[in-house]
């Protein structure tokens, strides 16, 4: 069966040893490498929320599967916007409904988790919490803290972000 050649400009086409038109080797290699890079250099994306109450306290969670207090949030699913992921994760983890536009605070590379992982951190000031979910398989505890009085076992990345948000520390590109 003879398959048609890919649509290439005539200048990119070559001739095979038997005189038929062919696709140059470097074009094929380039296309294969592009597909390989798309598969192996996938980006993972997470959305986290620094939920701030009217007293200026921030809501943190303690997970069951990793140490330290952290911002609530999670991964962006395929076909989901970052805003939708943030809203979904905050509702699932801490029972918070976002009622106003969250402020994108920063985008951070998180190579400690995965080489191509990135976290988008939002400051959420317009919200309501009609219920506090019971501890479950994912979230062991949630609590509000004043930025200057966080627990000693806060995760390093969360501590750096709190300093950026509340103490005007220089922003980093890395979580």
Regions found by a protein language model. Give the residues of each.
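Short, well-ordered beta-strand micro-motif
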Residues: 51, 121-125, 144
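Acidic, metal-coordinating catalytic segment for phosphate/diphosphate chemistry
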Residues: 2, 16-48
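Conserved Nudix-box catalytic region and its N-terminal flanking loop in Nudix hydrolases
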Residues: 53, 57-93
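Nudix hydrolase/Nudix homology domain
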Residues: 4-18, 67-68, 137-175
């Amino acid at each position: 069966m003879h398959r048609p050649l890919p649509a290439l400009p005539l200048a990119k086409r070559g001739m095979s040893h038997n005189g038929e038109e062919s696709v140059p080797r470097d074009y094929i290699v380039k296309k294969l490498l592009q597909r390989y890079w798309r598969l192996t250099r996938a980006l993972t994306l997470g959305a986290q929320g620094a939920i701030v109450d009217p007293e200026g306290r921030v809501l943190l969670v303690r997970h069951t599967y990793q140490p330290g207090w952290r911002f609530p949030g999670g991964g962006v699913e395929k076909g989901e916007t970052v805003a939708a992921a943030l809203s979904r994760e905050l509702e699932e983890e801490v029972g918070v409904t976002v009622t106003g536009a969250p402020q994108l605070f920063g985008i951070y590379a998180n190579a400690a988790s995965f080489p191509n992982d990135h976290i988008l951190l939002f400051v959420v000031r317009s919200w309501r919490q009609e219920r506090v979910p019971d501890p479950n398989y994912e979230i062991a505890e949630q609590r509000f803290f004043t930025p200057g009085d966080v627990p000693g076992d806060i995760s390093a990345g969360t501590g750096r972000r709190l300093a950026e948000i509340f103490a005007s520390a220089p922003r980093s590109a890395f979580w």
